[in-house]
């Protein structure tokens, strides 16, 4: 029993020990550390290998500060369980704390550093160890901090420690330099500790002796940095510290400003910075006052808010700094952003404090803007111990401030700049949104987001997805709207509970608490990080999940948990924002997103009728029950939703659907939209209304407009609450109604403007409009402008006032009448207009605004003929600015353009009748503009506007319509009247030479100088201070074209060599329509650089094909002129959305249909005499022998010229031939068929030698007509005479590649120099500067195109450095070798280093075409060790690079030159004929070049001496064949050569061996030896531009013939013959013996000669391809000639129909409507136009000659 009892007790004792660990934990929690240590030791006696117990025991020893035992316990626990990494750091900290110097601490710190790289704790431990080592440790610590900062530049603690290290060692200058360098870091600028360190360092530096010894500029620069640091520190202190600390810092800021104030002088950086910091000081003072009031009562709030308002007024009125005084772009940007931030915050706080308080700011300024108010402000901010007189605040002059309330437009502009200063902080954006939430205008969130996210699309087509890649600007805008909405509701709830009447709803930005939730902030930060690609490696997946989860909520997808009130708020805000946008695409996107949210709300509204919406637990946007939708509001919201649906239909152009939807809704909003739609329809019909049914339809639309406007007024009278729903003020509705009533009154039967079936001819006389054919803009501000029929009262008062001012000052005073005119404009808060193409006349912004006549569209002074609407494409008006009329004449500016209100009597040209006009002066004023409107107040019967009297009057060259009433009076009584003279010249001219006819786009009366003219002020002249240079008109080549389509795309080009698509550029792809010939073309320029990357005609044979794998891309084949010459390219355009791609396809096909309908605009006939067919026949013979074609090019040119001259003498037929002129610099033919031009001397039968190739504007000479009215024949006769002149135009084609009459397949290079004409340049070019590349004294040993890569250690990846020619160059003097590589086009260095003996090339794993090496590279100007890799396209090129590289190392050691290597696959250069031309004729050339035999080889060899060694050609012309396959006929061409030194296949050669004969040519006096006879770098032969790929057959054939040759061409002057003979079947006998070295050298030279021959063979292939391409172009020209004949016949048929219609119509308006068509097509002279106008009016009978 005793033994069993003992065993039982022992087991119990053991179990108690095992439980000791748990007892120890309990005692530890009870803070009984001794008992805990006792029990854990008891436990360890049983379980000694438990690492948890050892660790717990170490913790207990650590609490007792027994470091040694604690370290030992931790070490034992780590041995038992090694994964406990934190114990390593714990041991290191304990040993460093105990100042252990036996090396253990260093060991454990280094061990911990490996486990925790970059840990701040490790840094502190290392710093502690190095501090203990004295001066040596200081140096090590400095080096270590520098290396750590290179890896982690944003580490605040490490930056501060480095600056403190400098300061402790009295290296204050280095400390200041470090502070200045780190100021660019945004992370450091937002740290309070760092800014405190900077302020202390700069203050210490200014007070030190070092600063006193330095120059004055250094002191001023340091003071500038100190002020900037104070402003930043003050902002951070207000945000994070208490009031007392903020007051102390503000007082220190005050002292710094006072210190700098005494040193101000002149315009320098310190003065500009001081002025800006003064504004920040007062702004921060106002924020501090409001922060002090947070814990005060109502009385204290009143006093503090008034003082804060004073501070904000001063801060807002400090002007923006002159940033040009700041050195460096970074400093300028910083000061500019700080100024915008100050003005934004101060301006918003002024509006915030004065809201609801009338004259609040005025009372504040009157009360406190004096000495006593300054004392009150000083006492409120600073302590009473400081001296007021020595402070900046106490001594500043604040008595001259004004009461100036911020303008909303200015605030919106400042907000955009302030967003950059805060780096897109969500707190700042929310604060700005809250400020705008209480203002009548909408916040510019769209502009804010565009500023932050430049490349983000505005809307996505995939609203149903939640992928982070689909996020767009509208998603972020909706998010910000939601954050501002919920934050505003939260502030309102807080203010309702406890809020002082003087406390602003939203405190200043540094003072207010967080305005967004943590979830909202984390989502916003995640979005910004992903978009700007700043995610930490490994963290991107987590951020994507955060963004993806909330996108569902923002797009109201399933289970979104949004409050219906928030959805309604989003829908209304987006609709309102969309109405204010100008672009129709933007409108569609905004209103489309609004419709999306309305569709999500409507089902919820039905649920609300039954019960309430459940609230989620943790929503992204908090629900507020105060804005819950009530059942009584549901009907109103449903009505708003359907109105938005109808607006979207209207924006999309579905007008009928929109009208139907609006008519079903009985609301003032729908009435207003219906009135806008019908009024717009009436305007569109009114512009072209000719027939009575059209006029009746116009009246019906106006009646509907009137009825809807009356309904709005009636509803508003009965219920005033409906006025709030109107999108415009009620006054605008009444004004529009008044205008419509006036228009209806004008339509009344027998009215003064409705006679002879003419609809308001007085207005339409010089009024023209091109209505938008597809869409209606619903913006009354943009679409509906009107003018009262009589001048308003304010206009008369304004004129008298302006005259009085002009008499007093005797100078021209510019007056801005925009405010006066604002009540006659439609309000701007409505739908924005659709985007319209060029040429669609926009509205002017003021009555009587001078209007610029655009060259891209129909002039507003022409009335478009309704009978020839689709054909009216000829001759755009000259770029003329009309002169201005007197203010007595009433101008009307409407959507249609420019009109003049006249009386029923119409216009009267010439001298008016004496009895009807008061004689004001004997002659017009000298500076009077051409439009002279007389005062009609004293007239008995108003006769309208009087024209004439001087040459400065209107000359209506192309206007042929008559006015109503009396019609035209041609001024027969006036001998000075010249009728329609000067056709095609400027419509409005002025006698005053200095009177610049500038366009007044502002629509003001700024330039209406006539009312300000007095007799005393006529001779006033102001000399400009700085003479401006002559204005140079920018010519883009698109002047005579109309933009039919424009969209941003990414363009690609298919590279046939590598069979890949290559990106060509990003930009706007345009479809332009030529106003002269009606042909459309496609043009695209790259963004920013504006380089043309696509420029070609659109033809009926082009087909759009979808790119495989994408529904957003189209590809097509076209003859492109982007590089100046036609080149067959396969292009592809990628659009943002499939909808945009489909729209492009529709517009493209529409242009192709347009080509079928438009007749040729130049009515001449091209006749083919058969000479082109002869050329083609001769060219075809080249397939059987290129020698015939060669002979034709050289010997038959005389015949071609004779035939051409003979053909030109046959009249019109000869003049219309295609001319081929030989170029004296080019043996190939230059074909000229793209410069047909109609000349003034076109009646001459000879072909003119020069012509002006220009747009047919009014400035060009008057052209003779083809169909001519013979002056000697009475009646109406036709005589047909030649008027065609085909000539070479000396003017260059415009850069966009457009030329009138050029066929789309034309590919001919033209040279204007051969005409012998010289044109003085408009802008003289600077002197030619010789370009030095640094490679002048070096020979190119190796050169080939390659792709270079650089290894980036930070990311551990290879990064592409550039694509270009990599060269190995050797210096002639010191024999040093280096590698140089420049990028294509930009020519920037991407590799530049020496080849050293220790360098070695190694193959990259996985490929044999890539070489890797390490070098000290100088590409960026500084020495930098780089790991480089180069990749070649072909393996043999890579091998040759390695070979030359190794030879270079050997050559440097031996101090010898390297034998150059000529790349057989040189970098391809641009070809004038295009690479596609070679590919088209590949089969033909292959037949002639695959095998070389017999005499062909001999002829080929004879060309070697003639070949040029030039690597570049200066002329982009087609070279003749250098190497022709043939026999004896070719030898005659080169018969001038003295000898054939290298002949193949000549069996008759004396002493020949293998048929080879070698003769060294003598050196001539005037030329060098042949390139084959040269050595070194001079023996290179570069293939020409049209180069084919290598032909292995040729290489093998030629190499085999010269493989065993050991003879070369020596350089001696005497002729030495080396002959080798070999009997049949016997070995060769040598008649001359050579040493081994000579044989090796000569064999090498012979091999190089064979390589050169290979190059010539390839060049010959390319030349043959050029000739075949010319054949193709000749064929295309014949097709074009035939097509022109057909078009000319159709054009003549059309003209015949027009003339017959003219003859058989009755005299009057119907005949007159055909006058512009006949005038344009027949090119009538002024006299003929006058006769034709008389016939149209019935004043002269039409006589048709009878047939004999």
Curated annotation (Swiss-Prot):
Ranges where the RanBD1 domain occurs: 1021-1157, 1318-1454
Cited Pfam families: GRIP, Rab_bind, Ran_BP1, TPR_2
Domain GRIP: 1685-1735
Residue ranges, compositional bias (Polar residues): 1220-1229, 1565-1578
A GO biological-process term: NLS-bearing protein import into nucleus
PROSITE patterns (UniProt xref): GRIP (PS50913), RANBD1 (PS50196), TPR (PS50005), TPR_REGION (PS50293)
Residues annotated with Phosphothreonine modification: 14
Region (Disordered): 751-796, 1198-1233, 1291-1316, 1565-1606
Acidic residues bias spans: 1302-1314
One cellular component (GO) term of this entry: nuclear pore
InterPro entries named among the record's database cross-references: GCC2_Rab_bind, GRIP_dom, PH-like_dom_sf, Ran_bind_dom, RanBP1-like, TPR-like_helical_dom_sf, TPR_2, TPR_rpt
Superkingdom of this protein's organism: Eukaryota
Keyword terms: Phosphoprotein, Repeat, TPR repeat
Keyword Lipid metabolism applies: no
TPR repeats: 51-84, 575-608, 639-672
Basic and acidic residues composition bias: residue spans: 1579-1602
Low complexity: bias regions: 769-788
Entry annotated with the keyword S-adenosyl-L-methionine: no
SMART domains hit by this protein: Grip (SM00755), RanBD (SM00160), TPR (SM00028)
Other remarks in the entry: One of the 8 copies of RANBP2 clustered close to the chromosome 2 centromere.
PANTHER family: RAN BINDING PROTEIN (PTHR23138), RANBP2-LIKE AND GRIP DOMAIN-CONTAINING PROTEIN 1-RELATED (PTHR23138:SF168)
Protein's UniProt name: RANBP2-like and GRIP domain-containing protein 1
Species of origin: Homo sapiens
Gene this protein is translated from: RGPD1
């Amino acid at each position: 029993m005793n033994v069993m009892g003992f065993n039982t007790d022992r087991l119990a004792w053991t179990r108690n020990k095992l439980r000791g660990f748990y007892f120890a934990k309990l005692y530890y929690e009870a803070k009984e550390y001794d008992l805990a240590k006792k029990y854990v030791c008891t436990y360890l006696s049983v379980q000694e290998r438990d690492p948890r117990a050892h660790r717990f025991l170490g913790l207990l020893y650590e609490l007792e500060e027994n470091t040694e035992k604690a370290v030992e316990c931790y070490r034992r626990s780590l041995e038992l369980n090694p994964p406990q990494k934190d114990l390593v750091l714990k041991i290191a900290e304990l040993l460093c704390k105990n100042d252990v110097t036996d090396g253990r601490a260093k060991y454990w710190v280094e061990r911990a550093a490996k486990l925790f790289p970059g840990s701040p704790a490790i840094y502190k431990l290392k710093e502690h160890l190095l501090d203990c080592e004295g001066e040596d440790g200081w140096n090590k610590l400095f080096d270590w901090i520098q290396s750590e900062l290179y890896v982690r530049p944003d580490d605040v603690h490490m930056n501060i420690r480095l600056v403190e290290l400098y300061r402790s060692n009295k290296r204050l200058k280095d400390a200041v330099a470090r502070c200045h360098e780190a100021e660019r870091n945004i992370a450091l600028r937002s740290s309070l500790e760092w800014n405190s360190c900077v302020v202390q360092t700069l203050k210490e530096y200014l007070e030190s002796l070092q600063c006193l010894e330095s120059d004055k500029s250094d002191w001023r620069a340091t003071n500038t940095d100190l002020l900037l640091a104070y402003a930043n520190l003050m902002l951070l202190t207000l945000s994070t510290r208490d009031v007392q600390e903020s007051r102390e810092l503000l007082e220190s800021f005050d002292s710094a400003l006072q210190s700098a104030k005494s040193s101000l002088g002149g315009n320098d950086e310190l003065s500009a910075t001081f002025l800006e910091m003064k504004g920040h000081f007062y702004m921060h003072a106002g924020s501090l006052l409001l922060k002090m009031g947070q814990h005060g009562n109502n009385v204290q709030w009143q006093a503090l808010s008034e003082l804060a308002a004073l501070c904000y007024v001063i801060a807002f009125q400090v002007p923006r700094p002159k940033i040009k005084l700041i050195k460096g772009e970074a400093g300028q940007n910083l000061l500019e952003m700080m100024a915008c931030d100050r003005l934004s915050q101060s301006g918003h706080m002024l509006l915030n404090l004065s809201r609801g308080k009338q004259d609040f700011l005025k009372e504040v300024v009157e009360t406190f803007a004096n000495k006593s108010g300054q004392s009150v402000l000083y006492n409120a901010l600073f302590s009473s111990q400081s001296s007021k007189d020595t402070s900046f605040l106490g001594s500043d002059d604040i008595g001259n401030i004004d009461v100036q309330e911020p303008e909303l437009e200015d605030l919106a502009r400042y907000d955009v700049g302030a967003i950059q200063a805060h780096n897109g902080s969500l707190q700042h954006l929310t604060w700005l949104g809250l400020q705008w939430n209480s203002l009548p205008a909408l916040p510019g969130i769209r502009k804010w987001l565009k500023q932050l996210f430049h490349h983000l699309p505005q809307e996505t087509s995939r609203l149903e997805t939640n992928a982070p890649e689909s996020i767009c600007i509208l998603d972020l805008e909706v998010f910000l709207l939601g954050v501002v909405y919920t934050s505003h509701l939260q502030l309102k709830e807080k203010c309702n509970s406890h809020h002082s009447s003087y406390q602003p709803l939203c405190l200043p930005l540094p003072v207010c608490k967080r305005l967004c939730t943590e979830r909202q902030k984390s989502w916003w930060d995640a979005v910004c990080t992903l978009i700007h690609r700043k995610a930490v490696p490994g963290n991107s997946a987590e951020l994507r999940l955060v963004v993806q989860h909330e996108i569902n909520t923002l797009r109201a997808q399933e289970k979104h948990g949004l409050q219906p009130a928030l959805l309604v708020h989003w829908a209304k805000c987006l609709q309102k924002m969309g109405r204010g946008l100008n672009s129709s695409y933007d409108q569609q996107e905004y209103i489309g997103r609004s419709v999306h949210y309305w569709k999500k709300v409507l089902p919820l509204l039905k649920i609300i009728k039954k019960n309430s919406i459940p609230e989620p637990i943790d929503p992204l946007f908090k629900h507020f029950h105060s804005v819950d939708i009530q059942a009584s509001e549901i009907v109103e919201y449903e009505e708003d939703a359907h109105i938005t649906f109808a607006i979207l239909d209207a924006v999309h152009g579905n007008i009928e659907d929109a009208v139907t939807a609006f008519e079903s809704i009985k609301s003032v909003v729908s009435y207003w939209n219906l009135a806008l739609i019908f009024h717009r329809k009436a305007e569109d019909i009114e512009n072209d209304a000719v027939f009575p049914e059209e006029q009746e339809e116009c009246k019906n639309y106006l009646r509907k407009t009137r009825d809807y406007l009356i309904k709005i007024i009636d509803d508003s009278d009965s219920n005033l609450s409906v006025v709030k729903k109107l999108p415009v003020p009620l006054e605008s509705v009444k004004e529009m109604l008044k205008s419509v009533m006036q228009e209806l009154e004008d339509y009344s039967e027998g009215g003064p403007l409705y006679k002879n079936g003419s609809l308001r001819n007085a207005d339409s006389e010089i009024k023209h409009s091109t209505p938008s054919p597809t869409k209606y803009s619903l913006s009354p501000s943009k679409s509906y402008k009107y003018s009262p029929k009589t001048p308003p009262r304010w206009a008369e008062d304004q004129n008298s006032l302006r005259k009085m001012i002009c008499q007093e000052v005797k100078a021209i005073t510019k007056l801005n009448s925009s405010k006066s005119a604002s009540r006659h404009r439609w309000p701007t808060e409505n739908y924005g207009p659709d985007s319209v193409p060029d040429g669609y006349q926009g509205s002017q912004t003021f009555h009587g605004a001078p209007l610029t006549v655009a060259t891209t569209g129909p002039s507003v002074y022409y009335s478009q003929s309704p009978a020839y609407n689709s054909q009216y494409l000829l001759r755009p008006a000259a770029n003329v600015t009309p002169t201005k009329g007197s203010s007595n004449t009433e101008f009307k500016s409407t959507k249609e353009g420019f009109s003049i209100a006249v009386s029923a009597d119409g216009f009267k040209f010439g001298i008016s009748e004496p009895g009807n006009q008061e004689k004001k002066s004997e002659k017009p004023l000298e500076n009077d503009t051409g439009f002279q409107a007389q005062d009609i107040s004293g007239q008995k019967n108003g006769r309208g506007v009087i024209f004439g009297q001087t040459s400065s009057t209107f000359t209506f060259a192309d206007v042929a319509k008559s006015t109503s009433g009396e019609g035209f009076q041609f001024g027969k009584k006036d001998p000075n009247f010249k009728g329609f003279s000067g056709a095609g010249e400027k419509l409005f001219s002025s006698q005053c030479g200095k009177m610049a006819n500038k366009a007044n786009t502002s629509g003001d009366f700024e330039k209406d100088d006539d009312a300000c003219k007095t007799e005393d002020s006529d001779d006033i002249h102001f000399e400009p201070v700085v003479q401006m240079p002559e204005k140079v008109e920018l010519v883009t080549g698109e002047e005579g074209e109309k933009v039919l389509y424009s969209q941003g795309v990414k363009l690609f080009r298919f590279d046939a060599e590598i069979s890949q698509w290559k990106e060509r550029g990003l930009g706007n792809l345009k479809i332009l329509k030529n106003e002269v010939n009606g042909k459309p073309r496609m043009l695209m320029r790259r963004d920013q650089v504006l380089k043309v990357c696509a420029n070609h005609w659109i033809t009926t044979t082009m087909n759009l094909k979808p790119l495989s794998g994408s529904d957003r891309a189209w590809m097509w084949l076209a003859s492109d002129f982007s590089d100046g010459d036609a080149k067959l390219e396969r292009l592809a355009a990628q659009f943002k959305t499939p909808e945009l791609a489909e729209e492009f396809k529709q517009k493209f096909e529409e242009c192709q249909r347009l080509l079928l309908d438009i007749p040729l605009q130049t009515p001449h006939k091209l006749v083919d005499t058969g000479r082109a067919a002869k050329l083609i026949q001769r060219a075809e013979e080249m397939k059987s022998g290129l020698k015939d074609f060669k002979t034709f090019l050289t010997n038959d040119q005389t015949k071609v010229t004779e035939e051409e001259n003979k053909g030109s003498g046959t009249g019109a037929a000869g003049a219309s031939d295609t001319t081929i002129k030989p170029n004296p610099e080019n043996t190939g033919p230059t074909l000229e068929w793209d410069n047909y031009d109609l000349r003034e001397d076109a009646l001459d039968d000879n072909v003119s030698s020069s012509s002006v190739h220009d747009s047919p504007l009014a400035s060009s000479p008057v052209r003779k007509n083809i169909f001519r009215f013979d002056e000697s024949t009475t009646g109406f006769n036709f005589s047909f005479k030649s008027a065609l002149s085909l000539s070479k135009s000396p003017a260059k084609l415009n850069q966009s590649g457009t030329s009138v009459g050029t066929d789309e397949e034309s590919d001919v290079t033209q040279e204007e120099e051969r005409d012998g004409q010289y044109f003085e340049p408009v802008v003289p070019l600077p002197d030619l500067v010789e370009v030095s590349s640094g490679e002048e004294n070096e020979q190119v040993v190796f050169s080939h195109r390659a792709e270079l890569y650089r290894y980036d250690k930070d990311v551990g990846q290879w990064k592409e450095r550039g694509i270009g020619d990599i060269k190995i160059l050797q210096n002639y003097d010191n024999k040093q070798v280096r590698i140089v590589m420049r990028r294509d086009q930009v020519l920037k260095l991407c590799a530049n280093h020496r080849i050293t003996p220790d360098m070695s090339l190694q193959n990259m794993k996985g490929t044999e075409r890539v070489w890797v090496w390490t070098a000290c590279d100088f590409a960026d100007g500084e020495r930098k060790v780089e790991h480089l890799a180069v990749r070649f396209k072909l393996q043999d090129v890579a091998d040759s690079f390695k070979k030359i590289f190794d030879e270079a190392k050997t050559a440097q050691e031996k101090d010898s030159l390297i034998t150059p290597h000529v790349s057989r696959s040189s970098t391809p250069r641009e070809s004038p004929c295009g690479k596609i031309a070679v590919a088209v004729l590949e089969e033909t050339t292959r037949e002639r070049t695959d095998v070389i035999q017999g005499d062909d080889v001999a002829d080929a060899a004879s060309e070697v001496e003639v070949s040029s060694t030039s690597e570049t050609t200066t002329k982009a012309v087609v070279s003749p064949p250098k190497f022709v396959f043939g026999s004896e006929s070719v030898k005659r061409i080169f018969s001038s050569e003295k000898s054939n030194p290298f002949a193949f296949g000549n069996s008759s050669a004396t002493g020949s061996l293998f048929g080879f004969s070698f003769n060294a040519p003598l050196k001539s006096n005037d030329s060098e030896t042949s390139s084959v006879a040269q050595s070194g770098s001079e023996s290179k032969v570069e293939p020409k531009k049209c180069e084919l790929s290598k032909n292995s057959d040729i290489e093998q054939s030629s190499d085999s013939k010269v493989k065993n040759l050991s003879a070369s061409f020596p350089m001696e002057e005497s002729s030495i013959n080396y002959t080798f003979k070999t009997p049949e079947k016997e070995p060769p006998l040598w008649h001359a013996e050579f040493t081994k070295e000579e044989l090796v050298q000569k064999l090498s030279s012979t091999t190089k000669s064979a390589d050169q021959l290979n190059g010539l063979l390839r060049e010959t292939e390319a030349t043959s391809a050029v000739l075949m391409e010319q054949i193709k172009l000749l064929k295309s020209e014949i097709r074009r000639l035939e097509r022109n004949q057909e078009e000319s016949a159709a054009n003549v048929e059309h003209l015949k129909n027009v003339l017959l219609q003219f003859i058989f119509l009755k005299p009057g308006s119907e005949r007159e409507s055909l006058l512009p068509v006949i005038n344009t097509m027949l090119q009538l002279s002024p006299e003929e136009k006058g006769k034709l106008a008389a016939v149209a009016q019935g004043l002269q009978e039409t006589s048709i000659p009878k047939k004999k």
